Regions:
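Mid-domain alpha/beta scaffold segments of enzyme catalytic cores
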Residues: 1-299
């Protein structure tokens, strides 16, 4: 019933173990998930992510295995971490190698690589965060390297004919400039964090907009603008995601997020748009099928 266009199952399994990842996949199967996209962030993570998923699936009953193998898809991409930026050419070469091995006929999930990403621009400075991102470390070389890494991946997506999952945080102008220079406008602006005018720009270029659990705990003073934005995005460009294990929706804020919690984001956004949760599911499922060129799991 629910589609989730962005989660990191490998991060969840690293935190909690394969059995918990298996339980999450089981829950998604029992809930009738239509589409789930496990997102890549490192040049060399695609094959190990697939192998971890295979271990998790092996713990499931036969009927659930079939369901997971139908709804679960993968992306491959390089998040703009400092090390990846500094070694961008080698990283993109490794990414290509991983994609070639993953898509080799006869390999598990060989036809389930449906996107490149996530990659993009991140100028949210958080020295205590996972990446230890500090503005003082970002000299002119790193700024340009980040842009180059993004555009190299956009070129790869264009070459392979796959949608691109854009990570853009506090970097709208650079993101827009890179996309324009690449000439490629197919994919998702994930975990959208800008306003209506920025959304309009991306939409006019052909991009989809994805919202996550962060919408549910928007500050009260900013909620009118958030509601306006959630109503502004047209039906045929709207997608929903968890970004699990991050950004758990209310009432689970501060806890580890999983794709099983996406119902709360659907309920929240459906209410704002004045439609039923079931209708919103239908809309998002259709958009996923069209963007990624897949048949919905329930068909």
């Amino acid at each position: 019933m629910f589609s989730d266009t962005h989660f990191h199952l490998h991060y969840i399994s690293e935190k909690t173990g394969i059995q918990e990842a298996s339980a999450i996949l089981s829950g998604m199967a029992l809930a009738g998930a239509e589409f789930g996209l496990d997102i890549g962030t490192k040049a060399d993570d695609l094959l190990c992510r697939r192998d971890a998923v295979m271990q998790a699936i092996a713990l499931l009953p036969a009927g659930q295995k079939d369901a997971v193998e139908k709804f679960l898809c993968f992306s491959a991409g390089i998040w703009p971490g400092v090390d990846s930026i500094k070694n961008r050419e080698a990283c993109v070469c490794e990414l290509r190698s991983q994609i070639e091995a993953f898509t080799k006929p006869g390999e598990p999930f060989c036809k389930k690589l449906v996107a490149i990403g996530e990659g993009g621009i991140d100028h949210h400075w958080n020295p205590s965060g996972v990446d230890g991102r500090c503005e003082d470390d970002f000299d002119a070389g790193l700024y340009e390297g980040e842009r180059e890494l993004f555009m190299m991946q956009l070129s790869l997506a264009k070459e392979l004919g796959l949608p691109f999952i854009v990570h853009s945080r506090d970097g709208f102008e650079d993101t827009l400039d890179c996309i324009k220079k690449s000439g490629y406008n197919r994919g998702i602006i994930h975990c959208f964090s800008y306003g209506i005018e920025e959304a309009r720009t991306f939409l006019d270029m052909g991009w989809h907009i994805a919202f996550g659990g962060g919408t549910t705990y928007t500050k009260k003073s900013k909620m009118p603008q958030m509601e306006e934005l959630l109503r502004f995005v047209p039906e045929d460009r709207l997608l929903l995601e968890t970004d699990a294990p991050y950004l758990a929706p209310v009432p689970f804020r501060g806890q580890m997020n999983t794709p099983l919690l996406i119902r709360h984001t659907y309920d929240f956004i459906a209410k704002i748009r004045g439609i039923s949760t079931e209708e919103l599911c239908r809309i998002v499922d259709k958009n996923c099928a069209e963007l990624f060129g897949i048949q919905p799991a329930g068909v």
